[in-house]
């Protein structure tokens, strides 16, 4: 009797909540192609771990202290990634393999712990650590100390404009193409692009390299590099949205060419989500959520410049571009989880990768403030307040413009919940692309296909699904 009283039957809301959170935090693999890659191999990994540790512990030369420390750190990272594959969640993506995204999450946890460790060091210890990683950093200089910015802006010649198309211009272009692939909204991408140029103006008194001529900011940065990258990224998004994916199993492909093509397709998304950051029923919570998204995005970008300015290393140094690539890698699942949290009322909490990304952004800012107190003592509080107000205004203006566009030019359609197949809101409208859209966390179904949707959902329940390498029916 006591056990009956103590037990609690989960309500429908509790079940929906757990299901919705799991869809963005623990995506399951459906339509498994090669069973070997999705079977649990825990005993094999355990044996490999023990044997490899014994081999390196008793056979390598440990007479060089620096090599001992370096190889020990690499071994810790390597085996932590093995634990990540075994224990961490898949996240919202499953292509090319869930193990990859578990390792991405594991690397983000390691970086988070490394930032916590840095907070308990002094500046000399941090610099000694950097010199140990790369002795050439002893002779590094700040770009702002050897270059001039925003000089002779009234002189505009073709030679001067062409000279600005360097490797960094191509970096801007491809960087914004990738950002457009992640955000998938013209309005939000353009808002972030313009807001970043305003951010440079407000923080120009701290970072001299933010000073640019007006034609460099408006024409080269916003219109050509950023705008071209946004256009390319959105074209790719539109192509993926209109494309129908038929993920055939290797067992169903009998030609060598077909098997090779299927292997290449394994490194493309299983499906693509049509993203709607804004809808005509947006509330204050939606505005606040997108405002927070833009603030964290701008903060992450600012950290890139403050870190290399405070700790003195060039933008071309591996410490800079490796961090940029790493942040880009963890941004993909982060944006996906935050979008689901922001747009689906059934998702009551953010995913773990999104949580870790937010902590990393603020920890990097704290590290910059601690070790750059001389720099931040020159901060003009008025500029920071105006920057926050400017971001808030542009967020509201962009949201209002997107809502106005949706109300006047959007097509009224039934829409399904971001994480749930069977629920929709018929009174929300926004512009929709052609064809049926899918997502990494489950295909979006068209309202007219309710019968086929139900049958497909029943069929999916009978297929094998994998979570953290453990297969279950």
From Swiss-Prot:
Residues 2-35, 94-102, 208-216, 308-319, 377-383 are cytoplasmic. Catalyzes a base-exchange reaction in which the polar head group of phosphatidylethanolamine (PE) or phosphatidylcholine (PC) is replaced by L-serine. Catalyzes mainly the conversion of phosphatidylcholine but also converts, in vitro and to a lesser extent, phosphatidylethanolamine. Signal peptide: none annotated. Keywords: Acetylation, Endoplasmic reticulum, Lipid biosynthesis, Lipid metabolism, Membrane, Phospholipid biosynthesis, Phospholipid metabolism, Phosphoprotein, Transferase, Transmembrane, Transmembrane helix. It catalyses: a 1,2-diacyl-sn-glycero-3-phosphoethanolamine + L-serine = a 1,2-diacyl-sn-glycero-3-phospho-L-serine + ethanolamine; a 1,2-diacyl-sn-glycero-3-phosphocholine + L-serine = a 1,2-diacyl-sn-glycero-3-phospho-L-serine + choline. Residues 427-473 are annotated as: Disordered. The modification Phosphoserine is found at residues 417, 425, 454. The modification N-acetylalanine is found at residue 2. Pathway: Phospholipid metabolism; phosphatidylserine biosynthesis. Residues 57-72, 124-186, 238-286, 343-355, 405-473 are lumenal. It is a multi-pass membrane protein. The keyword Acetylation applies. The gene is PTDSS1. The keyword Heme does not apply. Belongs to the phosphatidyl serine synthase family. It is an enzyme of class 2 (transferase). GO terms for biological process: phosphatidylserine biosynthetic process. It comes from Bos taurus. This is Phosphatidylserine synthase 1. Its EC number is 2.7.8.29. It is found in: Endoplasmic reticulum membrane. GO terms for cellular component: endoplasmic reticulum membrane.
């Amino acid at each position: 009797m006591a056990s009956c009283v103590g037990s609690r039957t989960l309500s429908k809301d509790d079940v929906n909540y757990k299901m919705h959170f799991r869809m963005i935090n623990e995506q399951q693999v459906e339509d498994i192609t090669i069973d070997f890659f999705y079977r649990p191999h825990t005993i094999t990994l355990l044996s490999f771990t023990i044997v490899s540790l014994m081999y390196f512990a008793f056979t390598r030369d440990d007479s060089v202290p620096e090599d001992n420390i370096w190889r020990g750190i690499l071994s810790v990272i390597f085996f932590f990634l093995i634990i990540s594959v075994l224990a961490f969640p898949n996240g919202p993506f499953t292509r090319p393999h869930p193990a990859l995204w578990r390792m991405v999450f594991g690397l983000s946890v390691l970086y988070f712990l490394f930032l916590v460790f840095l907070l308990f060091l002094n500046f000399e210890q941090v610099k000694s650590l950097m010199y140990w990683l790369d002795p050439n950093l002893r002779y590094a200089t700040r770009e702002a100390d050897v270059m001039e910015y925003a000089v002779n802006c009234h002189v505009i010649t073709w030679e001067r404009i062409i000279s600005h198309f360097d490797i960094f211009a191509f970096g801007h272009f491809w960087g914004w193409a990738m950002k457009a692939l992640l955000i998938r909204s013209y309005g939000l991408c353009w808002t972030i692009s313009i807001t970043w140029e305003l951010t440079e103006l407000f923080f120009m008194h701290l970072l001299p390299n933010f000073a640019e001529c007006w034609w460099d900011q408006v024409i080269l940065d916003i219109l050509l590099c950023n705008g071209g990258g946004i256009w390319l990224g959105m074209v790719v998004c539109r192509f993926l949205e209109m494309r129908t994916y038929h993920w055939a199993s290797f067992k169903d492909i009998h030609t060598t060419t077909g098997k090779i093509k299927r292997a290449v397709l394994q490194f493309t998304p299983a499906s693509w989500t049509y993203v709607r950051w804004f809808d005509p029923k947006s509330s204050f919570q939606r505005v606040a959520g997108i405002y927070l998204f833009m603030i964290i995005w701008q903060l992450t970008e600012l950290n890139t410049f403050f870190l290399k300015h405070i700790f003195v290393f060039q933008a071309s140094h591996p410490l800079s571009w490796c961090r940029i690539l790493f942040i880009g890698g963890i941004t993909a699942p982060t944006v996906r989880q935050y979008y689901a949290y922001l747009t689906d009322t059934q998702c009551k909490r953010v995913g773990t990768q999104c949580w870790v990304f937010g902590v990393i952004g603020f920890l990097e800012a704290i590290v910059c403030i601690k070790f750059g107190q001389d720099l931040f003592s020159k901060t003009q509080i008025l500029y920071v307040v105006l920057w926050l107000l400017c971001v808030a205004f542009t967020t509201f203006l962009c949201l209002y413009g997107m809502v106005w566009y949706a109300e006047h030019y959007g097509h009224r359609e039934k829409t399904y919940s971001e994480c749930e197949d069977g629920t929709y809101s018929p009174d929300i409208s926004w512009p929709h692309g052609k064809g049926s859209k899918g997502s990494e966390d489950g295909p979006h179904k068209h309202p007219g296909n309710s019968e086929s949707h139900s049958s497909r959902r029943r069929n999916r329940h009978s297929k094998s699904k994998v979570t953290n390498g453990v297969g279950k029916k």
